[in-house]
């Protein structure tokens, strides 16, 4: 544990071997994402065991120093750990701290810029020739961006989306992505689509655009940093998953290419759950002090059942969004299970 102005604190956990810890992380990951246990708390035992192993040894120090944000630098085999879902027996870790994963301490951009003045480039696809459709994507993008808004987020327009540009399906091309990034300044880049990561095969790992696949080894060719993007949101499956050669996957490579922070996923995410999380995330981003606090408040809202579906509508902090028939459900459902909210993690700068 390294805290401001203090010497590093090292705790050796002799009772826990590396292989055992990695094994528990895998079991925990599998339990949260198991569709057969989605409406149970079967994950809770492992969530508490991992909390005791990873957080408990430092708990007194965290409280004594009044720490409010924890940055995790995770080793091989631990990077798929949904840290937000660790549990102390009473509450989840994210209910106590803002959280982020960092690739290395010397790679953090410590400059703080208020995100409330951001312009958003939102692009995505809902229709595919060889993959399942994502009917929630058009609603996700239109909820995030208000193309008629020409001014920064403020008290008078806080009930609207963000200023920026929106491109869907046929307009979500590699050429257009590059053109938009080179011709205008966007603080936030949001991509909503399918993605696939295959360990050891960068040429077969991709983010699906309308006209092509943006492969893992092509990520660094995009000019994300001219001017630098403060946040890249990868609203797609397994975009934070990597291997020994490519730590933190697509998000990790985007950080190397100049993006300050990335919000990415650890597993195959649910279309409606992603719509709910992203809608709330951008709403919280309007008033939160940091990006890490934004995702924290978003996840807390989901844990508490304040973000939910009721037949024809999605309800969240801004109000409600009508859903097309293809997304409507019978009855009511919330997103309090960690499958829906703990899979998205902030990587690199928490600010």
What are these language model-derived features?
Residues 1, 10-12, 71, 122, ...:
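Structured core elements
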Residues 1-69, 89-171, 273-277, 282:
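Peri-functional-center coupling elements
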Residues 67, 275-351:
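An often Trp-containing, charged/polar helix-loop segment at the C-terminal end
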Residues 70-72, 123, 144, 189, ...:
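Residue-level detector of buried hydrophobic side-chain packing
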Residues 78-88:
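A short acidic (Asp/Glu
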Residues 103-106, 110-111, 187-280:
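Catalytic cores of nucleophile-dependent amide-cleaving enzymes
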Residues 133-224, 270:
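Functional beta-strand-loop-alpha-helix junction segments that form "active/interaction loops"
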């Amino acid at each position: 544990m390294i805290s401001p102005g203090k010497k590093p604190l090292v705790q050796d956990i002799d009772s826990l071997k590396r292989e055992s810890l990695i094994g528990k992380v895998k079991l925990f990951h599998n339990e949260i994402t198991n569709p057969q246990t989605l409406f149970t708390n079967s994950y809770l035992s492992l969530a508490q065991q991992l909390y005791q192993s990873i957080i408990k040894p430092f708990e007194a120090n965290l409280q004594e120093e009044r720490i409010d944000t924890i940055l995790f630098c995770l080793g091989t085999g631990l990077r798929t750990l949904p840290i937000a879902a660790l549990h102390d027996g009473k509450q989840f870790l994210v209910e106590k701290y803002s959280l982020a994963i960092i690739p290395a301490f010397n790679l953090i951009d410590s400059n703080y810029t208020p995100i409330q003045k951001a312009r958003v480039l939102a692009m995505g696809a809902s229709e595919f020739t060889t993959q399942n459709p994502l009917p929630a994507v058009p609603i996700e993008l239109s909820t995030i961006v208000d193309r008629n808004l020409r001014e920064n987020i403020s008290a008078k327009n806080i009930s609207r989306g963000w200023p920026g540009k929106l491109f869907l399906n046929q307009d979500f091309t590699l050429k257009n992505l590059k053109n938009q990034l080179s011709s205008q300044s966007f603080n936030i880049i949001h991509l909503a689509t399918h993605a696939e990561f295959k360990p050891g095969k960068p040429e077969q790992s991709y983010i699906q655009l309308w006209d092509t696949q943006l492969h893992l080894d092509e990520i660094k060719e995009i000019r994300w940093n001219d001017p630098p993007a403060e946040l890249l949101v990868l609203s797609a499956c397994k975009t934070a998953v990597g291997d020994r050669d490519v730590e933190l996957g697509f998000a990790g490579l985007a950080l190397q290419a100049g993006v300050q922070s990335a919000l990415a996923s650890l597993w195959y995410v649910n279309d409606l759950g992603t719509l709910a999380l992203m809608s709330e995330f951008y709403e919280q981003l309007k008033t939160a002090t940091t990006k890490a606090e934004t995702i924290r408040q978003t996840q807390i809202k989901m844990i508490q059942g304040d973000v939910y579906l009721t037949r024809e509508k999605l309800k969240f902090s801004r109000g409600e969004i009508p859903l097309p028939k293809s997304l409507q459900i019978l009855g009511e459902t919330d997103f309090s299970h960690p499958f829906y909210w703990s899979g998205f993690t902030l990587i690199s700068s928490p600010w």
